Amino acid sequence: MFNLNEISKIDPEVAKAIELEVNRQRNKIELIASENFVSKAVIEAMGTPLTNKYAEGYPGKRYYGGCEFVDIIENLAIERAKKIFGAEHANVQPHSGAQANMAVFFAVLNPGDTILGMNLSHGGHLSHGSPVNMSGKYYNVISYGVRKEDCRIDYDEVRKLAKEHRPKLIVAGASAYPRIIDFKAFRDIADEVGAYLMVDIAHIAGLVAAGLHPNPVPYAHFVTTTTHKTLRGPRGGLILCGNEHAKMIDKAVFPGIQGGPLMHVIAAKAVSFAEVLTDEFKQYQQQIVKNAKTLANALMEKGIDLVSGGTDNHLMLVDLRNKGLTGKYVQHILDEVCITVNKNGIPFDPESPFVTSGIRIGTPAVTARGMKEEDMVEIADLINLTITDYENSKEKVKERVRMLCEKYPLYQ
């Protein structure tokens, strides 16, 4: 599919690396929960001369001339995003999910203000107040987490912390939480203490769009997301809000934290949003959830522990402590048999973030290839064989992975 002739002429080293990466994606089982395979149409949109165009500002209010056609594209992206999520306003310019989050912070907070966000080690995200992130350095961060007994969000703790610390902003949403999030409960708590509520749905946006997870738009003052992951668009960010906050959000994105938007990426966002609005996309999301539940159940049947005992969405966290293994080691041996996962901390993890006691597994990418429930049972068996009998099984597992990838070809 990919014609690298022009790149090969100018830079054969980069062309070769691209070819190797495409083949890696084709020939390995991709189980990283935050990764996905975009359509050829989305890839095509990103590779257009739209990358040549500067368009600081917003449609109809640009600081550069010659924006009449990129205005059409950005307006299409905006209107489609609003339709998908039922929002009054959408800003499609953030370059990433982290940029979308920082724009909301920039809009409503001053340095030193208090935010209440989910602890990274309990499933939150770097940009929700981690001390190593900008959000944790510029603001006073209070963290909530999950209950030790069931690894579910402790809404009583959230309420208690909110009343004690009176945050200006409460952040809901996660990067490694396999259960439904109660957005109404978060809004009730925010209202009790007079806080703004921001919900980051980067991981679950596709499920929300398909009606498979509650929509935070009716409850949150601000909703942020990436446009990749389950939404299966290009790498980028998106902010949704009501009309009353539209101007402050737009000003926070530009000129607040960004300059010129990436019009080739915004075009790809528009294309992917058109895909989201189809019946096929809804069916795809339904299959993601079916596959995740099947994979989770198959792993547990083999004696592999999952944090919270399963999943409601597209991902699961494997707790490896009962196997006496670390996430770092299991990520490595699975990669050796062509199965890609990421090491991940689990709640109350005794290991460091560089080692971890868990791995995170997701089904968006394998579902995009066309895999179904029976393939999840096979993948569970391959993971179990690798974890329990790596040296004796690795060649057989690699062959079974090869056969599975050939059955569901990618980017032909």
Curated annotation (Swiss-Prot):
Protein location: Cytoplasm
Family, per entry: Belongs to the SHMT family.
Binding site for (6S)-5,6,7,8-tetrahydrofolate: 120, 124-126, 352-354
Naturally occurring in which organism (per UniProt): Acetivibrio thermocellus (strain ATCC 27405 / DSM 1237 / JCM 9322 / NBRC 103400 / NCIMB 10682 / NRRL B-4536 / VPI 7372)
The UniProt record lists the keyword Amino-acid biosynthesis: yes
Modified residues (N6-(pyridoxal phosphate)lysine): 229
Record-level Gene Ontology MF annotations: glycine hydroxymethyltransferase activity; pyridoxal phosphate binding
PROSITE patterns noted in UniProt: SHMT
Lineage summary: Bacteria, Bacillati, Bacillota, Clostridia, Eubacteriales
Subunit structure: Homodimer.
Site description Plays an important role in substrate specificity, residues in chain: 228
Keyword annotations: Amino-acid biosynthesis, Cytoplasm, One-carbon metabolism, Pyridoxal phosphate, Transferase
Pathways involved: One-carbon metabolism; tetrahydrofolate interconversion; Amino-acid biosynthesis; glycine biosynthesis; glycine from L-serine: step 1/1
EC number: 2.1.2.1
SUPFAM superfamilies cross-referenced by the UniProt entry: PLP-dependent transferases
Superkingdom field: Bacteria
InterPro entries per record: PyrdxlP-dep_Trfase, PyrdxlP-dep_Trfase_major, PyrdxlP-dep_Trfase_small, Ser_HO-MeTrfase, Ser_HO-MeTrfase-like, Ser_HO-MeTrfase_PLP_BS, SHMT-like_dom
GO BP term (any one): glycine biosynthetic process from serine
Function field: Catalyzes the reversible interconversion of serine and glycine with tetrahydrofolate (THF) serving as the one-carbon carrier. This reaction serves as the major source of one-carbon groups required for the biosynthesis of purines, thymidylate, methionine, and other important biomolecules. Also exhibits THF-independent aldolase activity toward beta-hydroxyamino acids, producing glycine and aldehydes, via a retro-aldol mechanism.
Gene3D superfamilies, A to Z: Aspartate Aminotransferase, domain 1, Type I PLP-dependent aspartate aminotransferase-like (Major domain)
Name of the featured protein: Serine hydroxymethyltransferase
Catalytic activity: (6R)-5,10-methylene-5,6,7,8-tetrahydrofolate + glycine + H2O = (6S)-5,6,7,8-tetrahydrofolate + L-serine
Record's GO cellular component terms: cytosol
Cofactor(s) this protein cannot do without: pyridoxal 5'-phosphate
